[in-house]
Amino acid sequence: MRIENLQNENRKFAKSIGNFHVLEYVQDASVSPMNAMNEYFMSKMEVRRRQVVIDIDKDHSAIIQAGAMQWMGGNVQATSGVKGIGDLLGKAIKGAVTKETAVKPEYVGEGCLVLEPTYKYIILADIGKWGPAGMTIEDGMFLACDANVNSKVVARKNLSSAVLGGEGLFNLSLQGNGIAALESNVPEDELIEVILENDELKIDGNLAVCWSSNLEFTVERSTKTLVGSAVSGEGLVNVYRGTGRVLMCPVAPTTSLFESTNTMAAKAAAKSSNTFGK
């Protein structure tokens, strides 16, 4: 199979790591007179549709969110990845607590897999570079990953971090060697990467997008006394301790990642502009 014009003047690969590629639309050319102005200024602000393109072969299969596939070329087949009723129940529980789909299909074979377009920014992360413990991500960020990447639900070690930290009681952790495609509400170059070496990071608010799974996460007062916290006006802060990495978003709370530009909203926007609408 050969695709002649996957890239052209209006569609270009913005980023590629391994067999994962991000196809970005420079502008939305299929517009009506009613929304042409909005689409024009959206393109100028780089609010663009993006699609993940994954090369599938005997050495590379992919796991994606259910319903994220748009089209596939070649001898590519989808499998459920469910090994039994117990495995299905476990996946259902995992999906319920992390806001992810319960069953994520795995695509195998030889060919090309293209995912649904989204207005979110796509982060391609090399999970192996996050160490043996892997990385923990915000709810709703997972889009796809290499089949060699294992996912599991991690719970907070203490109640304070879950109740007061704003990050939830459970999160999805990715481990292994391979690439993962994550959906972000902000561009990757707006994220700040903090490298910790037996150190600590204190953040006022739930601004962490993803972090090394081996880091200890707690919620503490910004000062040693209640009076000091009251005077400083800072109150409680999220504290990450240990050795690892943290990606934080200083311009928008991460709680908006899933809520403001979720998949349904992206599809609704796509439908209104007559391009890839469903």
Question: Where are the model-predicted features located?
Answer:
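Composition-driven recognition of glycine/serine/threonine/acidic- and proline-rich low-complexity segments
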Residues: 1-278
